[in-house]
Amino acid sequence: MAASAQVTYTTAFHALHTLGQVQAGQWVVVLGGAGGVGMAAIDLARDAGARVVAAASTPEKLEACREVGAEVVVDYEHEDLKQAIKAATGGADLVIDPVGGRHSEAALRALRPGGRLIVVGFASGEVPSIPLNLVLVKGVSVHGLDLRQLHTVHPDLNAGTLPELLGRVAGGRLHPRIDRRFTLDQVVAALHCVADRQAIGKVVIDL
């Protein structure tokens, strides 16, 4: 597992398990499913026995989400995200959100009572404004996950996470996807690839 994939998988692991308390058979929605954290979340949710709805923005990205383990895919640029999630799940148990923007509220509205929204980033570049009355009326919870803070505040939680993940990769249970590799002199191109959200999976710079 490349060093960059370690970060995405550790983030997704704590979003799903530490905060999300995912259980087998539950419906997990992953926004930005073709991104680094998104792909890791799909892979880990599938490994936990959960059912996955993945949202992405192009046919190529949606197909990649299916290949990793998403049962349902949603093109959230052309479909009504809330309605698509509700139609597939009847109300999701858990949403993993590395994207932010306008899709966050739609996903929150698609949670079942008691569901959980885990915010792990704002890849869209837009921080969403979510009406807090939705949290109260729907009886859902919203959690934020910053891996750096987790390392600082709860170092004990991370002690066994990486060895566990590496063991699952070695055992064939997890399949990290590296989309593109760049050399150090191609770092500008690599940054553009990430900023323009072209990658499907993780981008790696070889030192």
Regions found by a protein language model. Give the residues of each.
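Mid-domain Rossmann-like dinucleotide-binding core that forms the NAD(H)/NADP(H) cofactor-binding site
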Residues: 2-78
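N-terminal Rossmann-like NAD(P) cofactor-binding module of classical short-chain dehydrogenase/reductase
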Residues: 29, 74, 93-96, 118
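C-terminal hydrophobic helical "lid"/dimerization subdomain
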Residues: 156-207
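Short amphipathic alpha-helix with an adjacent loop that forms part of the alpha/beta core around
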Residues: 80-90
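Short glycine-centered segments of the SAM/dcSAM-binding site in methyltransferase folds
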Residues: 27, 51, 94, 115-116, ...
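Local beta-strand N-terminus motif with an aromatic residue
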Residues: 25, 70, 91-93, 174, ...
